[in-house]
Structures are given as structure tokens and as C-alpha cells.
Amino acid sequence: MYRYEKKGPKRGVALYSYSAEFGLTKTLEDCFEDLHDMGAHGIEILANTHIENYPYPTDEWVEKWWRLCDKYEIVPVEYGNWIDSHVLGDRDLTTEESVEMLKRDIRLAHRLGFTVMRTKMPVINDLLEPVENWKEIIKGALPLAEELGIKMCPEIHTPSNLKGKLVNDFVEFIKETGTKNFGLNIDFSVFRTSFAEGEWVDPNYTPNKPEDIIPLLPYVYCCHAKFIHMSDDFKETTIPYEEVVKTMEDNGYEGYLLSEYEGADKYDEGYEVGQTLRKHHILLKNLLGD
């Protein structure tokens, strides 16, 4: 199993960036090759998109996965999963059924070498507040997560406020349980300060300040390094990357920054996101000095 031991923040890629190309013009190995070429060492996958025959991949597919990780020197960093309580249509899953769904993903994430899961829970409103029984669901899966060394992390995404109720509830849960197997994934969209003319902006959104992340860092096990627009001189023009990354680095963050591209142009015919990802990784290399 390939290991990457660099101290401080590390560079990786969320395969969601390839959403317009994966399965059409790019294979899983093509994505791995891209990551290796840009010097990334970590990967996030979306389980139901990137795992063949999910949730029951064959032994042959799993062997192929490990072969790709070793060949391209890539660490399995974050496994994206959903607790889809609405999957049945006519009724919501019970708490027990949701726990079993989550346990299934924990086992598969462990089988593929991941230590962090981006665990998306069903939400009840535009502020992304989770269903009322989220604590019971997480508690039901915690013993298995502890046994297998998996950290479950809901994604903190725009329009969430890092000082708001949603984040506070998660932090209080961590403190109350004392668990090291539940934490946060901070999506850099929460720091976005610039929007294109005519672009829709959530009325609930107020940009967070880079320093707002400092008290949360003990609970942050992974980050989506969201980016929207890269200039030709390797700057992200909508998010204050220099301030955010420096704040995290100065305050001891050791996890991965997973590049996640959400520019609308990636769905244009013929667009290749790999070139935009390379620009982003030049930015990260310049900031991190690697």
C-alpha cells in the first residue's frame, strides 16, 4: 500500500471534478494518471459513481483499485457516501435501516483503504440541517467506525456559517461523545467572496473569514478545496486561497486539500477539467511549497 508521509497540508483531487467526463471520455485509470501527472497524492471518490457495481464490487475490481493506487502513488483519502433515507420513495428508512446502510459503506470504505468518509445525511431545509435522528444514526455506526479506523465527516458547504448552529451541533456531538471517529469536511465554498454577474447567490450566505476555521481544525479531517475560476497566472479569483491555506497551515492542519472544480464550463462539449486541475495544483504547490 502506497503511503505519503509529508507533514502539513497535502494535495489531492476529488473525482467529482471529472463528473462531465468520467465514464464517457475518461476511465478510472485515466483519472489516476491525471492525478499522478499533476503531483497529487490523495483521492476522493463518490461511492455510487466511481465504484463499479456499487455497493458490491467484485474482488477483481477491488484488486484493480489497489493496483492503480500503487501504480500512480495515490492514497485513498476520502470516500463519499450518502445516507439516502428517501431511497424507498413511499417511506423514509428507519433509524436502524439507515445505520445498516452507513455500516455497509464503512466496511466498503475500509476495504478500499479509506480512513475518512464524507458522510452526507439527508437534510430538512435550505440551511442544510440534517434529519432529526442524525445523532442516533451516527451513534449506531460509531462502534464499527472505531473498530475499522474510519472517521465520518459531514460536509460543511455554502451557505453554512462556520459559527452557526449546524456546525455547533456537530462540534457539541463530538465533545459529548468524546469520539475521534466523527468530524468535519470543510468545503472552501464557505469562504467564497466573489460571484459572476447574474450568478445566483443563496440569500442565506455570508462569507466566512479564514480565521473562523481555526477553532474547528481539531475536528477537520479533510477539506474540499473548492475552486470556481483559475486565472492564467494561477490565482483562484473567487476564494481567498492564500489567506485560507496559510491560516490552516499556521494552525497545524495535517490533512488533505482535495481539489474540487465546480465551474459551469466543465459541462461544455470538449472541455477537459484536467487542465484546470493542473492550474489549481500549481496554485497549491506555490502556497504549500511542494
From Swiss-Prot:
Gene3D superfamilies: Divalent-metal-dependent TIM barrel enzymes. The active site is at H157. Optimum pH is 6.0. Optimum temperature is 60 degrees Celsius. InterPro entries: IolE/XylAMocC-like, Xyl_isomerase-like_sf, Xyl_isomerase-like_TIM-brl. Disulfide bonds: none annotated. The keyword Cytoplasm does not apply. Transmembrane segments: none annotated. Its EC number is 4.1.99.-. Can also use other divalent ions such as Ni(2+), Mg(2+), Zn(2+) and Ca(2+), but Mn(2+) is probably the native metal ion. It is an enzyme of class 4 (lyase). Its cofactor is Mn(2+). GO terms for molecular function: lyase activity; metal ion binding. Keywords: Carbohydrate metabolism, Lyase, Manganese, Metal-binding. It catalyses: 3''-dehydroisoorientin = 1,5-anhydro-D-erythro-hex-1-en-3-ulose + luteolin; 3''-dehydroisovitexin = 1,5-anhydro-D-erythro-hex-1-en-3-ulose + apigenin. Mn(2+) binds at E155, D187, H224, E260. It holds the Pfam family AP_endonuc_2. Heterooctamer composed of four alpha subunits (DfgA) and four beta subunits (DfgB). Carbon-carbon bond-cleaving enzyme which participates in the metabolism of C-glycosides. Acts on the C6-glycosylated compounds 3''-dehydroisoorientin (3''-oxo-homoorientin) and 3''-dehydroisovitexin (3''-oxo-isovitexin). Belongs to the C-glycoside deglycosidase alpha subunit family. PANTHER family: BLR5974 PROTEIN, HYDROXYPYRUVATE ISOMERASE. This is C-glycoside deglycosidase alpha subunit. It comes from Eubacterium cellulosolvens (strain ATCC 43171 / JCM 9499 / 6) (Cillobacterium cellulosolvens). The lineage of its organism: Bacteria, Bacillati, Bacillota, Clostridia, Eubacteriales.
